[in-house]
Amino acid sequence: MIPLKIAIAGANGRMGRVLVEAVNNHPDTVLSGALEHSGSEALGLDAGYAVGLKTGIAISDDVDAVLAQSDVLIDFTRPEPTLKHLQKCVEKQVNIIIGTTGFDDAGKAAIRAAAEKTGIVFAANFSVGVNLTFHILDTVARVLNEGYDIEIIEGHHRHKVDAPSGTALRMGEVIAGALGRDLKQCAVYGREGHTGPRDPSTIGFATVRAGDIVGDHTALFATDGERVEITHKAGSRMTFAAGAVRAAVWVNGKTGLYDMQDVLGLNNR
């Protein structure tokens, strides 16, 4: 089997370094390129320097050159650079795995449009456990559909720039969808001051940013006399990286927009 050639965007970032390691660990993939922004101090260094690997791939800011020798790009950066990389992937007929969060509606529309021409796996979280949690939440919300207050609590490291996390929002979307609600209409983000009694139709969000928390997410369903809490805690970024590489292998040869539920066979298509 010819190894799948994978490039990593943001290769010197916290997630990018782990992605380099994950590609190296997978028996069916090979690192074909590593991207960083112009001016990065890491340009020219071996992509594996930070994790003790010698990959033979130098970190570059030449997107065209990197994509020309790659089958797929994995991007866990920020919305603006991800959308630029997305357009390049369409031009070069390179598939893309998007783990970036914080897109606005226009950004999501651009991803949907690009999926008509290339294969995209776009997910809020690439952990197998988190995606199984999404699947479970759909069932739980359908059963606990009356008389339960729903809150989503998430925690991440001090460096995370968007809140609530993409995973927390996806949990909210899954729950709202199961209940026949529109999350944009029923979400409450944080509470302060005299808020009055809780509206039973709302889904609340609370955010923690502290230390080096990799990712903690809890969906709470509470009523008189009982609470149901569904929690996922990530202890290492490798769980996300390994899932992203799995998605890259899965989407090879496909066109269209997919998520991690598709990769794991949890969606009925």
UniProtKB/Swiss-Prot annotation:
The active site is at 156 (proton donor/acceptor), 160 (proton donor). It is an enzyme of class 1 (oxidoreductase). It comes from the Bacteria. CDD domains: DHDPR_N. One of its GO terms (cellular component) is cytosol. GO terms for biological process: diaminopimelate biosynthetic process; lysine biosynthetic process via diaminopimelate. Its main location: cytoplasm. Keywords: Amino-acid biosynthesis, Cytoplasm, Diaminopimelate biosynthesis, Lysine biosynthesis, NAD, NADP, Oxidoreductase. NAD(+) binds at residues 10-15, 36, 99-101, 123-126. InterPro entries: DapB_C (IPR022663), DapB_N (IPR000846), DapB_N_CS (IPR022664), DHDPR_bac (IPR023940), NAD(P)-bd_dom_sf (IPR036291). Pathway: Amino-acid biosynthesis; L-lysine biosynthesis via DAP pathway; (S)-tetrahydrodipicolinate from L-aspartate: step 4/4. It is found in: Cytoplasm. Its EC number is 1.17.1.8. (S)-2,3,4,5-tetrahydrodipicolinate binds at residues 157, 166-167. It catalyses: (S)-2,3,4,5-tetrahydrodipicolinate + NAD(+) + H2O = (2S,4S)-4-hydroxy-2,3,4,5-tetrahydrodipicolinate + NADH + H(+); (S)-2,3,4,5-tetrahydrodipicolinate + NADP(+) + H2O = (2S,4S)-4-hydroxy-2,3,4,5-tetrahydrodipicolinate + NADPH + H(+). One of its GO terms (molecular function) is NAD binding. PANTHER family: 4-HYDROXY-TETRAHYDRODIPICOLINATE REDUCTASE 1, CHLOROPLASTIC-RELATED, DIHYDRODIPICOLINATE REDUCTASE. Catalyzes the conversion of 4-hydroxy-tetrahydrodipicolinate (HTPA) to tetrahydrodipicolinate. HAMAP family: DapB. Belongs to the DapB family. This is 4-hydroxy-tetrahydrodipicolinate reductase. It comes from Neisseria gonorrhoeae (strain ATCC 700825 / FA 1090).
